[in-house]
Amino acid sequence: MLALLGIAAILTLIGLILSNRCSPIVALVLVPAGAALIGGFGFGATKFMVAGLTSIAPVVAMFIFAILYFGVMTDAGLIDPLIRIVLRIVGRHPKRVVMGTALLALLVHLDGSGAVCFLVVIPAMLPLYQVLGLDRRVLACAASMAAGVNFLPWTGPTLRAAAALHLSAISIFRPMIGVQLVGIAFVMAVCWWLGRKASATEATELPSHTLTAAEQTLRRPGRFWFNLALTLAVIGTMITGVVPPAIAFMVGLALALVINYPKPADQRVRLEAHARAALTMAGILLAAGVFSGLMSGSGMLNAIAVAATSHLPRAGGAHIPVVLAILSMPLSMLFDPDSFYFGVLPVLAAVHRNLGGEPIQVAQAALIGQMTTGFPISPLTPASFLVAGLSGVDYSAHQRFSAPWLFAASLVMTVAALAFRVFPL
C-alpha cells in the first residue's frame, strides 16, 4: 500500500511540474502532504516535514549567501578585467576565440547561474564572431559546453541532489573535481577543433567590453585584487572543508559588502538587487525538504525501494550509477530539474542503497548530465532558449549542432568517473 501511494505521489508531482499546472513549491508541499493524509499519518506527518526542513537548512543557507556573494562581486566588477583579458588574448585567431568563449563562460558561471553566464558571455563575444565571420552556432555551443560541465556545489543540480538525498553539496562535489577537470579539458579540446575548422574574415575593428552608466556607478576597480583574493579564499576554504560552505559565503558576503559598499543604504540596495534570485530557489529547496522529509519519514520512499529491489538482481545494483550517468544528459529532454531530482533521483538512490550501493554515487552520476550538460539544449529550461536567442541562431539549429558535443562531454566524464572510481562499473 505504501509503495503504491508513494509511486502515485511521485508521478503526480512529476506530472504537475512538467505540465506547469502549478509551481514547484506548491507541488512539492501539497502532493506529499496529501499522500501522508491518505496514508493515515494525520498531523503526525508534520514532524516529518520539520525533519526534512532541518536536513536541508545548511544547503539553503549556502545557496542564498552564494548567490548574494557572487552578485555583489559582479556588481563590484570582479569579472570585468577577466572579460577584457580574454578579449585581448583571443585577437583574430578563430581557435583562440572559441576557446576564449569557453574560458570566459567557465569564469562567469562561477556564480552558478546558466542564464547569467549566457547573458554576460554571449553579448561580449558575439561582435567578435560577427566581425570575424565565425559560425554563431559555435558560439552557442562553446558557451553551452563550458556551462554544462561546470557543476559546482552551489549550482542548481548539485543543490537539488543534496537536498533530495539529505547529503551535503560538498560531499557530492569533492570526489567529482577530477571528473570535472577532465570535462573541462574535453570542452577546450572540442573548442580548439571547432575553431580550427572555422574560417574567419579579416576584422577591421575588434569589439570592446562596454558598461552602462548604471554599471559604472557600481564598479569598484580599485578593490579588484581584494575581491579576487577574497573569492579565492571563500572557494578554497569551502572546498577543503576548513569551514562549512554556508559560513564561508556568509562571512565572504559580509566582508564584500563592507569593503565595496560601506554605506548601509548601498548594502541594502545591493542585497535587494539579488534577493529575488536567491529566495526563489531557496523556497523550492525548502519545499523539497518538506517533500523528501515526508516521503522518507512516512516510509513511502523505502517501500518503493523495497518493491523495486525485489524485482532486480542484487548484482544489478552496482550498475545503476553508470547507466544513469550515460542516460543523464538525454534525460534532461524528458524531466525538468525539479521533477527529476526530487521525484526520480530519491527512488533510484533508495534502490541502489537496498542493493548494496551508496546513494551518493547516484547523485554524482546524475550530475554528469542531468540538467548540467543537458540544460543548454533542454526545452524544459528557459536558459536553452536564451542561449539560442542571444547567439542569433534558430533554436532547433542550436540543438542539432550542440547536442552531440554535449552528449560526448557527458560520456567522457562518465569514463573519467569510472577511472577515478567515483562509482563502479
Predicted features along the sequence, with ranges:
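Transmembrane alpha-helix interface/packing and boundary motifs in multi-pass membrane proteins
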Residues: L13-R21, F70, L104-S113, S144-N150, ...
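Core transmembrane alpha-helical segments of multi-pass membrane transporters/permeases
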Residues: V26, A45-D80, V98, L106, ...
